[in-house]
């Protein structure tokens, strides 16, 4: 059983976030913090202060879910909150972030297992299949651009050591076996 701890009511907020219709969400995006040692609280403080996304800071943490290196999972935002995690994709996507710097040998396998279960649960709740779980680097316009017919990578997020095809296959197996139903809110 995987427990998702809802901390949405206690995370810092810099201002009232925009709301959206959750039925418009068609993509689950996997991210990494890209900072060594950062946890959900460090990430939330960074996002709600002036940062690389906004000189004013984001209204909230940029991710709806967060998975620590030890596999502890958090719900940070409800699906109706429009988070600032992938530019033009913000209206139609929901973010899941790994506490992982995005380099080295890759995140711990247990952390990836928990992230896959969280992504499967979110996908089922939104009526999506595993093909709609993408890494930030896979999103055109934010993860990569096409210039003069060439694919130009802009982001490595959630880390190049994460095989997104294998991750999607894992999410798909969880959905087929309905194992995502063992992911519960606490």
Short names for language-model regions:
Residues 1-25, 78, 92, 98-186:
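Basic/polar, cationic surfaces and motifs that engage anionic cell-wall
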Residues 2-77:
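Short, conserved "active-site rim" segments that organize catalytic pockets and cofactor/ligand binding
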Residues 48, 54-58, 72-110:
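Peptidoglycan-targeting cell-wall enzymes and recognition modules
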């Amino acid at each position: 059983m995987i427990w998702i701890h809802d901390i949405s009511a206690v995370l810092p907020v810099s201002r009232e976030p925009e709301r959206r219709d959750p039925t418009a969400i068609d993509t689950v995006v996997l991210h990494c913090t890209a900072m060594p040692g950062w946890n959900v609280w460090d990430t939330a403080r960074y996002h709600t202060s002036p940062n690389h996304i906004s000189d004013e800071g984001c209204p909230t943490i940029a991710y709806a879910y967060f998975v620590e290196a030890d596999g502890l999972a958090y719900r940070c935002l409800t699906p109706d909150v429009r988070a600032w995690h992938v530019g033009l994709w913000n209206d139609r996507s929901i973010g899941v972030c790994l506490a992982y710097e995005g380099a080295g040998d890759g995140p711990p396998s247990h952390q990836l297992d928990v992230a896959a279960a969280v992504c499967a649960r979110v996908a089922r709740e939104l009526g999506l299949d595993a093909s709609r779980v993408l890494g930030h680097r896979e999103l055109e316009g934010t993860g990569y651009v096409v210039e003069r017919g060439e694919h130009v990578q802009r982001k490595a997020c959630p880390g190049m050591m994460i095989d997104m095809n294998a991750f999607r296959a894992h999410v798909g197996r969880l959905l087929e076996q309905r194992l995502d139903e063992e992911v519960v809110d606490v």
